[in-house]
Amino acid sequence: MGEEGPPSLEYIQAKDLFPPKELVKEEENLQVPFTVLQGEGVEFLGRAADALIAISNYRLHIKFKDSVINVPLRMIDSVESRDMFQLHISCKDSKVVRCHFSTFKQCQEWLSRLSRATARPAKPEDLFAFAYHAWCLGLTEEDQHTHLCQPGEHIRCRQEAELARMGFDLQNVWRVSHINSNYKLCPSYPQKLLVPVWITDKELENVASFRSWKRIPVVVYRHLRNGAAIARCSQPEISWWGWRNADDEYLVTSIAKACALDPGTRATGGSLSTGNNDTSEACDADFDSSLTACSGVESTAAPQKLLILDARSYTAAVANRAKGGGCECEEYYPNCEVVFMGMANIHAIRNSFQYLRAVCSQMPDPSNWLSALESTKWLQHLSVMLKAAVLVANTVDREGRPVLVHCSDGWDRTPQIVALAKILLDPYYRTLEGFQVLVESDWLDFGHKFGDRCGHQENVEDQNEQCPVFLQWLDSVHQLLKQFPCLFEFNEAFLVKLVQHTYSCLYGTFLANNPCEREKRNIYKRTCSVWALLRAGNKNFHNFLYTPSSDMVLHPVCHVRALHLWTAVYLPASSPCTLGEENMDLYLSPVAQSQEFSGRSLDRLPKTRSMDDLLSACDTSSPLTRTSSDPNLNNHCQEVRVGLEPWHSNPEGSETSFVDSGVGGPQQTVGEVGLPPPLPSSQKDYLSNKPFKSHKSCSPSYKLLNTAVPREMKSNTSDPEIKVLEETKGPAPDPSAQDELGRTLDGIGEPPEHCPETEAVSALSKVISNKCDGVCNFPESSQNSPTGTPQQAQPDSMLGVPSKCVLDHSLSTVCNPPSAACQTPLDPSTDFLNQDPSGSVASISHQEQLSSVPDLTHGEEDIGKRGNNRNGQLLENPRFGKMPLELVRKPISQSQISEFSFLGSNWDSFQGMVTSFPSGEATPRRLLSYGCCSKRPNSKQMRATGPCFGGQWAQREGVKSPVCSSHSNGHCTGPGGKNQMWLSSHPKQVSSTKPVPLNCPSPVPPLYLDDDGLPFPTDVIQHRLRQIEAGYKQEVEQLRRQVRELQMRLDIRHCCAPPAEPPMDYEDDFTCLKESDGSDTEDFGSDHSEDCLSEASWEPVDKKETEVTRWVPDHMASHCYNCDCEFWLAKRRHHCRNCGNVFCAGCCHLKLPIPDQQLYDPVLVCNSCYEHIQVSRARELMSQQLKKPIATASS
């Protein structure tokens, strides 16, 4: 026998149970056109007639020339072949996808592949949710993705929290029964059941034998103001024999009695401000309660008549008696009233939805659209559901009566009515957290059969059990959101995502049929939760119109004419504009747009245009000409198409271009990465043949700056765009070219007010505080270095070093560098691809590129020398102080990423994001993250909302996306106020890419990929509201910066003022004058005169020395003062001992003594206060050094 070793099980990881399958390609040169998720593996890849098609274990991806289809496999309802060459794919959310093939054989082959991929699973592990969770959990901390797996604390402790929130009297009136522990009574009910306190478990067992599926009447909601409760159950099993059950009748009437014994705040004289109730009715109830309050609980008035709401029609209820069911008889249930709502069963709803899908898949503009939509009866079914919920809400709120809701089995129409009524009654369920609790408690805990209704239950072939019940309920919530847009914390995108993942099987939330099955299969621990994606801290799903203080009871209009078709789900392609296509021109006129973006700061320079056609600008056959200035850059690129074709799927069949790096590096395959972005004004001026205007004459403070900046740094500060070329390893101009540019800078033309003395003083103060020692190590690609070592340049904008960029812009743009900081440099290792308006793709060679941009290839060796001498330097950032660059360039958290959703140019808190490719990916893949963002933290894929081109294409062997460097707040503003970011998780391997233009509308619908790998739902209204909010935050931040700059300017003025005259003793002279006879200057030596003489030598006293820092209370701070991340159990609050504000641990982790606060030991301070204290100490030391020679000379 061989050597004995440890058991092999110790070496098995969870992801090893789900190994990726081998990829089958129809052509060897094809590459996967999307970025896979954790555990996702592409199994088939080939070409259709006009598209690229791929099937993974999670999704079907079809890349057309002008669109992309991205559908999870479990969302596909049926696949069939039509017209011999066409695949007709029907989805469970009513979408219909058609894909054409060139041959009948190929069509049948892909039909067979897709049919096998979408077949019912043989075992639960065949669902992708298990593989996704296993691959999200790695052995190392870097591979952990637990934030994608676990729900929040409000989900785990929802039952206890709900009982406390609704104010149940668990001592005298109600009790929590554990009769269903381990699901021994009813597998489709939760383990804890709320019943009246005098109902015993034996009676509950007897009632369970009388109710269908043992689903007994239990209470699920209590109205806080009047104590009325909502209960739910299934139908009674009366059958044709007319069976009765005394315990069931007693339990139903006991619910009404318990509500009378546990009145709400109205009966006890509490607040009456909730809802739209009649004032006289509230006063009468309060008066009646005051008469009986002294006599105790026993003297409470008779219980209200309980309403039994049967969701079925009376005919259907009676017909169910033949199957052993039935309905309650009012004669047997005293003090009860039975009402039938006439809601259709699941078979009618399924047929209606199929008709709706057929209507939505017709031609875009059918002549009979309205009549066809009416014939589906989908809106009619929604109307009946809303009417039932409104009846329950009015009965509870206005009449104060308890309600018992049931249908046949109690797991389809019953949760629809109960959950919708709770949304109408309780504003908590209209919040993000409350809505999640509502879905968990009323749908999942009470056994809605998601596995059967959604069609992903294993070994079930009966299609009659499939029905979009939950989708229909979400549609009704969408109708409420349309009618009450200010009363819901979540937006439409939240509901659309919930629809997608009800069927996607990416998360385990909606797997299995009841909680008993989920617990037996350990689904909660083996799969991720959808609430991790739809968490409350994700600002992508926040409704910016939400009014949190409103507690109004909703009374919606339920008529069919007031309802709307949910186009975001049923007709997603009908939306008039996507976020990738829309820009500020949709909302603002050209004049208003200019004022919106350039007028927020009085000293911001307007953006100018240097060429009419960016496409012809890249053509060397046409000379570069300068045109008149125009601040509206977006208006001149309307006809440009965004090239979204991957490099491997050129429709013309052109070969992949190989470009020589120019410095002896290996050749790299470059894909079709679209058109070059619109260049900012200064970069266009640099590329044009016209000279620049000089800034040196705008203010005498420029000379002061020149004297303060070291010579080595002054060579890098001639222009923002030139500086960026030097930062990102592109060939830099030689010193002679820079001198020429410096002599010809007069073309820009800036008013004198744009170069105030404050900028010089501010920049000088930064030079003094930095001592020119905080240098940023910018990552470079080793293959572009002549010596094979990484080159590093110095981005001045990340230091406190002044440059002409500071003079070109206002004080506010010191922290918001121009878009050139994000523009891709002209790099010899990048093949620039251009596409003319007709759609043909042309490749511009390396030599043609450089010929149109003269004097850019000189001085590369000089850059390499300067870059290599800066290794190991520290980065001095106003937010973090001095620290190694690696600590600053770090991936941000998931909660921080959610802050940047569709904020345009106003991303006010950004420290760094990471984009890489999953481990094991051996081939370059195109990251279709045009506008939105998905993230895989810790060396996995991360995408940020907004235009993000960080991974348009990449090579595993060193081709990464360039890092976007910026100053303190770290965001980069592109032309027209849009953002562009390039992200990399490997700072030492960076290469340039050519992004797609940001502001050019495209007929190609872009992909907004989220954490789930699916397109992000677009909402132009919420997008505009985010822009408005972000603009407000930016204005506030600019005002804060201006205040800080003004304070620093005043401090420097006091610090740099000439020293006062040394104090001398004039007391003898004054005494002589005072004692002399006939002196008229007797008052000259008074105390007032002495004060006037010595006033100039007084040191300024800071107000903080006489004030006590008051801390912001914990309950008033829900978000970090700096990064605006939300506090929760794992993100605690930290007070800064200097300013008193509340921060998270990342923004408040440094310690310093604060003598001004009598804190002589190091205490916790925020990053900004840390820097301020450090600067103040350095200024005090400098002042002391200046006073020493003066005191020596005077002595």
Curated annotation (Swiss-Prot):
Membrane topology according to the record: Peripheral membrane protein
InterPro entries for this protein: MTMR4_FYVE, MTMR4_PH-GRAM, MTMR4_PTP, Myotubularin, Myotubularin-like_Pase_dom, Prot-tyrosine_phosphatase-like, Tyr_Pase_AS, Tyr_Pase_dom
Record-listed Phosphoserine modification sites: S8, S610, S629
Effect of C1169S: Loss of localization to early endosome membranes. No effect on function in mitotic abscission
Binding site for a 1,2-diacyl-sn-glycero-3-phospho-(1D-myo-inositol-3-phosphate): N320, N345, I346, S408, D409, G410, W411, D412, R413, R453
Reported regulation of activity: The phosphatidylinositol-3-phosphate phosphatase activity is inhibited by vanadate.
Protein name in UniProt: Phosphatidylinositol-3,5-bisphosphate 3-phosphatase MTMR4
Gene name per UniProt: MTMR4
